[in-house]
Amino acid sequence: MPDPSTYRPAPGSIPVEPGVYRFRDPHGRVIYVGKAKSLRSRLNSYFADLSGLAPRTRQMVMTAAKVEWTVVNTEVEALQLEYNWIKEFDPRFNIRYRDDKSYPVLAVTLNEEFPRLKVYRGPRKKGVRYFGPYSHAWAIRETVDLLTRVFPARTCSAGVFKRHNQIDRPCLLGYIDKCSAPCVGRVSAEQHRQIVLDFCDFLAGKTDRLVRDLERKMTAAAEDLDFERAARLRDDIGALRRALEKQTVVFGDGTDADVVAFADDDLEAAVQVFHVRGGRVRGQRGWIVEKSGEPGESGEGQLVEQFLTQFYGDQAELGSAGDNAGDSGQDEATNPVPRQVLVPCLPDNADELTEWLSQLRGSRVALRVPQRGDKKALFETVQRNAKEALAQHKLKRAGDFTARTAALQSIQDTLGLADAPLRIECIDISHVQGTDVVASLVVFEDGLPRKSDYRHYAIREAAGDGRSDDVASIAEVTRRRFYRHLHDTQHPTELSAEGKSRKFAYPPNLFVVDGGAPQVNAAQAVLDELGISDVAVIGLAKRLEEVWVPSGSDLGPEPIILPRNSEGLYLLQRVRDEAHRFAITYHRSKRSKRMTASALDSVRGLGEHRRKALVTHFGSVARLKEASVEEITAVPGIGVTTARAVLEALGVPQAAPADSGTAAAVIDDDQRRVTG
């Protein structure tokens, strides 16, 4: 482990201006990013007294091998640069406020001719308007089910919409008037879009206008003696009011605000946010984070600053991704940064943080501590939620952590390892009768899957022509994986643009193969060949769940049988089963691509779009084979030269061109079609 004194900057070399700094490990990876009003004061605090640092900060300083800094003009610039660097490098020692679950949102696809309402998780898309997040998907479905009585918008997928359009008959929702059935032409595209826009206005908080419009229409219908329509409008008004009743009014002045509260202990913190729009609570989110314990920083003020920077920076990016100049433009109720942000305390750089938030919003943002009245009462409610979330997390983690610790300790004791296997890697081979032979490698750290480090391998040397050798495949994958590790170790400067290793950053403590003695010995032979002696190798056989060790091991030639109730065996089974699942998924993908391949794939210059157009036009490859050149060129984008190449690939003999002039004309015609 590096000695901090070896990379400590020389006295007087650090500037006193504000700036942003980053620590790098011996491989050049960025492991921590921070900012400071005075770079000299802050960086010196890391090296003055290591024993006085928080454990996490001390570990960071001991892991690092280099520190760099960038001087900026203002603290607002430092705030923005720190956010950008954390986003770019994802340093392992920085707090990252990631949701404790993937919260669903209600997406309205305004970029489609007939917009659709749907539950959605994932990155924001241009031309789509989002509402939420909601705590559960069923809450979205319940809201949509209630409001489609008043706003009968489309909720079906593209396939269902197309099918009912073809049979000219609406679905059940169309028959019960919960969909305006644009698929069969009951309403025009413009009428349906207006229904969807009214739906969006209601969710955005513009409720009074919509209710008044319905009341006016109900009165007019009653005056015209159209009592059936008046009764329906009365029921619609009741449905809207029931929806409003579910959103309790917390601020009588119709305020837009986010209320943020924390609960923390020495190691972790829980944060809860209530999103209030138009005076009503529209959503709630929660996070659990590990505290950094950065020197010279107050606890809660630091949490407030880091959370607001990361959360609203991310939200502004999502908002711009989903923004569109047309129908999906942001309004007051959907702007990711509200007019007010209520927090438990103001950070030291509150003025700079407020200025940055105002820039994100496009207008003034108020950062305040609630003191009395409704805002204080709601803040206390949010704080109770944060305390409850932290208590539940600690209770759950205590059970999970105890089990994982017991599992790792069991494996260490059973195999006689010097340390607990904090990083476990497992490989598995998958094929069907020697075809599409692939391998998977999965990684578990601290007993939990680390999916960002998972890898697929297509077997090159140990398979082919319908043959497969599992033992040779294990050896090939082991060699490829650890050759990369040796390459990274010998060339530590070869990093990606983000400062990360291009492949694997760290070797495993334990390498698991799916199989028995032959597979284990094959993997061990590769490690011996490469000169790697600090990685333990075992095999886990499915029969009796035996744990095999390499020949010549001090543990003896016989397999080890772990107790059936052993936490260590349970962890090894989960690792092995995850590797098998990952390999099967990749194998099925490769096999599906191979089985769906056709003779058209070999036609030079014929891409997927035009292949699909040909098959769609003729109905099948067999019918395409019977077509003439003239019939094929009737398909948009297909010229004479391409048509001849298609027929040649399908085995249809072609007559040679009559002369060079004709050939030139054909080529010219084909070029005109492609460029057109």
UniProtKB/Swiss-Prot annotation:
| An example Gene Ontology biological process | nucleotide-excision repair
PROSITE patterns of this UniProt entry?
GIY_YIG, UVR, UVRC
**Top-rank taxon, per record:** Bacteria
Molecular-function GO term, any one:
excinuclease ABC activity
Instruction: Recite the UniProt keywords alphabetically.
Output: Cytoplasm, DNA damage, DNA excision, DNA repair, Excision nuclease, SOS response
Asked if the record carries the keyword DNA-binding, the reply is no
User: Sorted alphabetically, which InterPro entries does this protein's record hold?
Assistant: GIY-YIG_endonuc (IPR000305), GIY-YIG_endonuc_sf (IPR035901), GIY-YIG_UvrC_Cho (IPR047296), Hlx-hairpin-Hlx_DNA-bd_motif (IPR003583), RuvA_2-like (IPR010994), UVR_dom (IPR001943), UVR_dom_sf (IPR036876), UvrABC_protein_C (IPR050066)
Q: What does this protein do?
A: The UvrABC repair system catalyzes the recognition and processing of DNA lesions. UvrC both incises the 5' and 3' sides of the lesion. The N-terminal half is responsible for the 3' incision and the C-terminal half is responsible for the 5' incision.
Protein name per the record: UvrABC system protein C
